[in-house]
């Protein structure tokens, strides 16, 4: 009951728009999402949860649009996908994962348009080095 009472403080601004910190709950009482509104728009860091309490997705909003790095998770807690948004559009490098944690595929977006996809087996030497945080010269190739 106290969590619900917290939601009743400063929910709306003088124009009747959502403003400030909000929490939403599933009917079972489990936290559904939490984050801030500014003048009716989501703004700042938000987290959304599966009904079992596991994190579903997290990321940042700017004036109601997704912006920056976002991550989604399977209901068991494993990473499902991650990537970037710019002004609400998918943009840049994205990765998708199986629920086992294994990389499924990766791709690249420009201003919301899907440009390129690579299978896991098509990683370049530069991409492998970047993933492990080392230089290409540090890679050791076994034949």
In which residue ranges do the predicted regions lie?
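Glycine/tyrosine- and acidic-biased, solvent-exposed loop/turn segments at the edges of beta-strands
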Residues: 1-125, 131-140
């Amino acid at each position: 009951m106290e969590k619900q009472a917290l939601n009743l403080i400063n929910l709306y601004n003088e124009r009747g728009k959502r403003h400030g910190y909000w929490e939403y709950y599933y009917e079972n009482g489990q936290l559904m999402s939490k984050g801030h509104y500014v003048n009716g728009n989501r703004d700042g860091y938000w987290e959304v949860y599966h009904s079992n309490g596991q994190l579903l997705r997290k990321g940042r909003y700017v004036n109601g649009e997704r912006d920056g790095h976002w991550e989604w998770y399977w209901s068991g807690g494993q990473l499902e996908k991650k990537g970037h948004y710019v002004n609400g559009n998918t943009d840049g490098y994205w990765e998708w994962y199986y629920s086992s944690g294994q990389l499924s595929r990766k791709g690249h977006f420009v201003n919301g348009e899907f440009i390129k996809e690579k299978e896991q087996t098509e990683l370049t030497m530069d991409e492998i080095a970047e993933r492990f945080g080392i230089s290409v010269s540090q890679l050791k190739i076994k034949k």
